[in-house]
Amino acid sequence: MNRWLLPEDIADVLPAQARKVETLRRAILDLYQSYGYELVAPPILEFLDSLLTGTGSDLNLQTFKLVDQLSGRTLGLRADITPQVARIDAHLLNRAGVTRLCYAGSVAQALTPVGGSSREQLQLGAEIYGCANGEADFEAITLLLKTLDLAGLKKVYLDLSHAGILTGILEGQQLDKESIETLYGLLQSKDRPRLRQWATCLPAKLAADLLALTELNGPCTEVIANAKKVLPRHAAVDQALADLECVVSAASKSLSGVELSIDLADLRGYQYHSGVMFAAYVDGLPQPIARGGRYDQVGKAFGRSRPATGFSLDLLTLAGLSPLNCRKLAVLAPWIDDADLNQVIADLRNRGEVVIQVLPGEVLEAAEYECDRELVKQGNSWELKKK
């Protein structure tokens, strides 16, 4: 066996990429802090029952499992940080008002994600707890778009949906868990022939409503207008459309350079989402660069129901798409025993400069740094000169 091989869909992050990832991580977390978000760092391992509380079967399948040698209980290696942050808000912080939290940490997935990305990701996200209003959803969307803009991704396509639409349509229907999962899969793929065949055992009006969802996608105002015509008049459906109208109205007034659309059959994450959902797309990536939405019921599983909304993305993917040049400029210095030189180097480093002292016999080959200046002794002092 080759000792340098890694598991399938697991990869090292090499210096140039790691530099970009870390530069973006710092800048993005500083952005979140400027909005009042507090950084939290949940553990990478938790007891499995806690880790999966309030989530669906998809997360269970994606979670690596192992036995705790101390307690004998099953542990899970987290595949998603969002439920952990919900636990922190509900159980540890226990605040009454609005709480804004952000995070950045590694997650591991047992199965290769859709789109063939790495099974190890650096998940970054922001969550708002304690506000049920549409303004919180819009703040989350705004912060996501600013995140992408900070990474240099200027052309963004934002797709909206709402979990309440299907909840309202299915109210009163006795569908088992397997049937619901099949239905969501058919809606997600917009496979109308199979959906029509699957729905033959349902009431005709319900089958027609489900088929209508697969065609309710496109420009926001057009989709909302058509949805009001073809979907049933139901409190949950009406509220969902009103929520979407609120977000679209706010976006049209204050967001520029973003193409908005609605897809009422896009229900990924349906297991825990409860309201407005959104996905951001950028050129060069067929899958969403980020996903988010409202998930008011997750905290209830930890003993404290709280309105919640937010988003997350993979920072490794974001860095790979970012056009930013994060290559660091550096100063070259000789490796000699000189107190004055050492003091100059220390002063430069304290000011944030990168100073590379060339070791005896070293041939500088690293592409990570661009040495555009060097320290040269002129008379009795060391001077910084351009190379």
Swiss-Prot record:
Q: Which family does it belong to?
A: Belongs to the class-II aminoacyl-tRNA synthetase family. HisZ subfamily.
Misc. comment: This function is generally fulfilled by the C-terminal part of HisG, which is missing in some bacteria such as this one.
Name the CDD domains on file.
HisRS-like_core
Record organism = Polynucleobacter asymbioticus (strain DSM 18221 / CIP 109841 / QLW-P1DMWA-1)
PANTHER family under this entry?
A: HISTIDINE--TRNA LIGASE, HISTIDYL-TRNA SYNTHETASE
**Function according to Swiss-Prot or TrEMBL:** Required for the first step of histidine biosynthesis. May allow the feedback regulation of ATP phosphoribosyltransferase activity by histidine.
- Compartmental location: Cytoplasm
One Pfam match, given by its short name, reads tRNA-synt_His
The beginning of the lineage is:
Bacteria, Pseudomonadati, Pseudomonadota, Betaproteobacteria, Burkholderiales
Q: In which pathway does it act?
A: Amino-acid biosynthesis; L-histidine biosynthesis; L-histidine from 5-phospho-alpha-D-ribose 1-diphosphate: step 1/9
Q: Which UniProt keywords apply?
A: Amino-acid biosynthesis, Cytoplasm, Histidine biosynthesis
Q: What is this protein called?
A: ATP phosphoribosyltransferase regulatory subunit
Question: What superkingdom does the record give?
Answer: Bacteria
Kindly state a single biological-process term from the GO annotations of this entry.
L-histidine biosynthetic process
Q: What is its main location?
A: cytoplasm
